[in-house]
């Protein structure tokens, strides 16, 4: 009986060792699955009506739009970016982002193309929504294995939700919340400084269309930024985010201030010179009084510069309040 017990015990021991070894062999996938579950994957987002589902954290990101690139840098996610696009017309990254920004490879200078994004090996695209045209669609990109999150915010609440979503996707939710809190504090301070002031009538000068001026309409985040800074966008009732208006309409509206979007080319100084030389716009009292507020183009986009934009606008509208 003793010998039989020893044999049974030996067999049980061998079985336990084999099970342990088998467990070790499967430990990496188990750990991966556990990590994925802890991160909350799979995740589904309502991205402005587009249902985005992610089974795992993206590894290779393309950003289209300087605002999208800067937002990733602000959240410490620059190492995820394998290429960026749409630096045409952009001025420059903020000083605190410049080193990281300059280290990111440029996929395309202008709009990204379907071929360029797919051939890059990217698995995720964060792009300002006006790049989606022709065959460069969310459907075509996702059919080629590239998940897409569209940067389409038209309000401050919406851009903050985008920041929260990006934070959740890449496991940096605490950073996202801290960044939003910092932005909110700065906006609150700027709004407090101009509280009680009579709103100034504002016209946004983006670019000359040849037969008018391209400006910000109602569903444009800049309309809310202007309001936060103590202004009133004279063309907020127009139903498009960006729309051309005639010189006669601008003259009739009689703005108190003109906000000039500063591109790489033409720069703000060239636009101001053109306004002063124009036989219609030069009639405006604000032009004669040189009431111009220069806003970097990137500040007008939904991204990491919400507070920067409100501060710049508020100081331009009410310089004596600061």
Where are these regions (language model features)?
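A short, structured surface patch at a secondary-structure boundary
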Residues: 63-120, 124-131, 234
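Bacterial Sec-type N-terminal signal peptides, specifically the leucine/valine-rich hydrophobic h-region
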Residues: 18-21
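Proline-aspartate-enriched helix->loop->beta-strand connector
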Residues: 107, 114-127, 146, 246-263
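Bacterial Sec-exported substrate-binding components of ABC uptake systems
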Residues: 6-7, 12, 23-70, 173-205, ...
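Alpha-helical, coiled-coil/dimerization segments enriched in small aliphatic residues
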Residues: 214-243
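Extracytoplasmic ligand-binding site segments that recognize negatively charged/polar headgroups
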Residues: 92, 132-136, 151-165, 199-221, ...
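Short helix-initiation/N-cap motifs at beta->coil->alpha
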Residues: 47-49, 104-115, 238-247
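Structured C-terminal subdomain patch of bacterial secreted/periplasmic proteins
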Residues: 160-161, 165-168, 174-181, 188, ...
